[in-house]
Amino acid sequence: MFRGYIDESYNPHVFSLSCLLSTDKVWGEFSRAWRLTLNSLNRKLKAQGRQTISRYHAADSSNLKREFADWTTDEQRAFFGDILKIFRRYPIDTVALSIDLDEFHRIIPEAQTQAKPDFQTFLYGMTTKFLIERIADRRCSKDPNARIALVHDRSANDSVMFEAFSQQVNDPNFAFGHCFTTFVSTGWERCIPLQPTDLVAYENFKDSMRRVTPRDRRKSLEMLIDLDSFGGRSQVMDAKAITELRAGLLAAGAIASASEDKPGTDGTFPTK
C-alpha cells in the first residue's frame, strides 16, 4: 500500500499542490526518525531556556518567524541538515502541480468571476483532479495493481477536495480510478508525514515563483533533488497549458459566454 500526503502552498500569483508518496512501512520509519530528531532539538532548546517548537513549519523556519523567531540562520541550516539526513535514508517520491495564477486569470477570466461558490473552491477542486491524474501517471501506469491512499492537510476546502477525488476516481474515462482507495483529511498534530509534506510543498511553491520573480533555485531544494532517495515530478501549468485548457472548455461549450459560464464547485465546468 502506498500512502500519499498532500499539502498546498500559495500566494496571489502561484498556487502549488504537492504530494509525497511512499509505502506505509517507509512512512512508519520516516515518522519515527522525524520524531526523534524533533525531540532531540527540543531538549537542546529547553536546556538553553528557549522556546521549543511544536513542529517543523517550512515558511516559519525559512523566514525565522513565530517559533523560529529567535533562531540564527546557522541554527536554521543545521536543523535542515538534520532533516535532510532523514530524507536521505528513506525513499520518497513527490508529485507536484503549480499554476501561474496571473496567467490563469488573464487567459480564463471567466473562472475568477463566475466560479461557484468562489474561485478558491474551484481552484482546489480542479488542482485535486489534476494532481490525482499525475500521481496515476507516475505510479499506476507502471503498476496498474498499485493501491494508493491519500491524506490531505486539513483545511476549509476538505469537502470540495473530497468531492473532486470521488468524481475523478469514479470517472469511467479515468483508467486508474481503481488504484485510489481513500482520501481523508487530518492535522499535522496527529500526522508527522504532513510536516515533510509541508516542507516540499513550500519548496515547490518557491521554485514555481521563480517564473514570477526570477532568481536562483533555493539551495534547500537543490539539496533535496540531489538525494538519490528523493525523486519525483513537478509541473507548472503555464500559459500554454492554460490556453489548451481554455480551448477544451470552449470546445465543450462550457464557457461560450460570460452569461453561460457556470463552473461547478468541484473544479469542473458542466458540459451542455
Model-predicted regions and their roles:
Residues M1-G4, E8-K272:
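Phosphate-ester processing/binding pockets and catalytic centers
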